[in-house]
Amino acid sequence: MPFRDLILFNLSKFLLTEDEESLEIVSSLCRGFEISYDDLITYFPDRKYHKYISKVFEHVDLSEELSMEFHDTTLRDLVYLRLYKYSKCIRPCYKLGDNLKGIVVIKDRNIYIREANDDLIEYLLKEYTPQIYTYSNERVPITGSKLILCGFSQVTFMAYTTSHITTNKKVDVLVSKKCIDELVDPINYQILQNLFDKGSGTINKILRKIFYSVTGGQTP
């Protein structure tokens, strides 16, 4: 594994989270491989990072022993950093009244309803006639489905990124520990790939490069 990737990964982590352990690792690697301040800012040209990068060379405590390999948790750390301070919300649809409550999952012509009040059921029967759609007691997979949320203020990142959500009130997209655990599951590799490919900005581009280096893929 190129030592520069280790430096860039830990420096990105420090710049995002101010993690002191990452700062110590970067400082130690830079001293050991004679990496200068000018070398680092070529990867981080944005001036807002420069005062933090200077701390790398002001740091006194250095690690006596350093691993030249990424840890087993690196992929999870990459996802955490990519979604660090993630902020997204879903705007309400004017067609859905404030009086509607419940969850509806629509996949093809199958409809699964949960915790719905009478107003929501009445709305569904008008919009999705039983002559065409099948109302089922069995859960319908969320992935690739249309999700109608009424009366909720939050939705998980996994639900947001794998389905088309319509809501009757503003909904915040939540990134949780469980969500990150699900994302690093090999079955969700395509979701991860899309997540890193869509990233813009200096640090996101570096995280994308390291993501493909760690997973063995080819950077687009």
Curated annotation (Swiss-Prot):
Record's keyword terms, sorted: Early protein, Elongation factor, Protein biosynthesis
Keyword Ribonucleoprotein tagged: no
Induction comment from the UniProt entry of this chain: Expressed in the early phase of the viral replicative cycle.
Disulfide bridge partners, by residue number: none
Record-linked Pfam families: Chordopox_G2
Main function: Involved in postreplicative transcription elongation on intermediate and late genes.
Quaternary structure (record): Interacts with H5 and A18. Might be part of a transcription complex composed at least of OPG087/G2, OPG145/A18, and OPG110/H5.
Membership in a protein family: Belongs to the orthopoxvirus OPG087 family.
Protein name: Late transcription elongation factor OPG087
Protein's organism: Vaccinia virus (strain Western Reserve)
